[in-house]
Amino acid sequence: MLDEKLVLVTGATRGIGKAIALTLGAAGATVIGTATSELGAENISKVFTDKKISGKGMKLDVTDNEQVSNLVKNIGEDFGSVDILVNNAGITKDNILLRMKEDEWEDIINTNLSSIYKMSKSVLRGMIKKRSGRIISITSVVGAMGNAGQTNYAAAKAGIIGFTKSLAREVGVRGVTVNAIAPGFIETDMTDSLPQDQKEALASQIPMGLSLIHI
């Protein structure tokens, strides 16, 4: 289905990003999955090899302009231009606003929102040139509903929604689609680290009171 397509997935070492990378790889795509460390990138490459998926893991700090530029340049030299970008990389640093430190705010905005701008812009020219491309960003229901103790995370995820709608209007006529996916509460390594009261608050908003899926 995705033969000859090149996919770039940020934050592919675990959780949602890993599941996306493996699913697209199983569908025939060549997949580049990023990790924040060399060891993480090596682990991605090993998983791809074990699963007989074409592609590799590569180290990337999504907040670093130079690293983003170099990554896309190296991918272009080794594999060609990216057909599908999945902006998945994200972190949490939860705190109530009165106790939130400035670095807790800035780290979330830089990693979860500003990286979307950096990554999307870096691959967009190649997509427009081919008049074909897909940019998919992982946001969250928290971006629409809010959640106490997550003003930073909610602001970043809401920003992704606005960014996505605006960019879609810019490049749709050029053959590039831009969409966002807002998962509910999914059990991953990241959500496992949430305080129990936040898990219960999120679960209370789900009709069955359960997470939708465990990854």
Q: In which residue ranges do the predicted regions lie?
A:
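Conserved small/polar residues in nucleotide/adenosyl-binding loops
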Residues: I213-I215
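Conserved glycine-rich cofactor-binding loop
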Residues: T13-R14
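Alpha-helical segment proximal to the catalytic Tyr-Lys
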Residues: R125, R169-V173
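Active-site helix of classical SDR
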Residues: S120, A156, T164
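Substrate-binding pocket helix/loop in short-chain dehydrogenase/reductase
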Residues: I96-L97, K101-I109, T191, L202
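Conserved glycine-rich Rossmann-like NAD(P)H-binding loop of the short-chain dehydrogenase/reductase
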Residues: A27-I44
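Residue(s) in the substrate-gating loop at a strand-loop-helix junction
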Residues: S140
